[in-house]
A protein has these predicted regions:
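Phosphate-end processing signature that detects enzymes handling 5′-triphosphorylated RNA
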Residues: 1-168
Length: 168
């Protein structure tokens, strides 16, 4: 069974920008969510995918991801996902033998910059770059649904400080 082991962090400063080795515009949409699981469609560059993600246990969850036709992804994003879509630029940033994904959000989530690292084992050691901030792997305030709700309720994008101050 495919397992994703991922840790997520706030980004504290722009020190990562000088190390970018690749960048890609992505559009993600939430197809559905139930009992801690979710189905996400993604469109980026020349590829599209759909992922079924299981309930998170710490930094671990099952993930089944499949390529789909770009036209199908566009249709799902436009007709199924509605306002549960997010646009971001994902930057690949190498550091100490790992490639970090640094996501810079746009639109309703503008101003939010998150970094994630995928590991092969939950106890795998890694060196944290100087530009890394607080870990948010299990912080429900930074789940996409919570980010959307908080920004929608505020009627504007929120700063990271406002998100950190928000109740879960």
């Amino acid at each position: 069974m495919p397992v994703e082991i991922e840790r997520k962090f706030l980004v504290a400063n722009d020190g990562w920008r000088s190390a970018i080795c690749d960048s890609e515009k992505l559009r993600d949409g939430l197809v559905g969510e139930f009992d801690g699981c979710k189905v996400r469609v993604r469109l980026g560059g020349n590829r599209a995918s759909i992922a079924v993600k299981g309930r998170r246990f710490g930094s671990r969850r099952t993930e089944f991801e499949y390529e789909i036709p770009k036209a199908d992804a566009e249709a799902m994003l436009n007709t199924v996902c509605g306002e549960r879509c997010v646009e971001k630029t994902r930057h690949s940033v190498p550091h100490a033998g790992f490639i970090w994904a640094v996501d810079v959000y746009e639109g309703q989530l503008a101003g939010i910059v998150l970094a994630e690292i995928e590991l092969s084992d939950e106890k795998q050691a890694f060196e944290k770059p100087d530009w890394l901030g607080t870990e948010i792997t299990n912080d429900p305030r930074f789940h996409k649904r919570a980010l959307f709700r908080l920004c929608t309720d505020a009627g504007r994008p929120l700063t990271v400080a406002e998100l950190l101050a928000a109740a879960t």
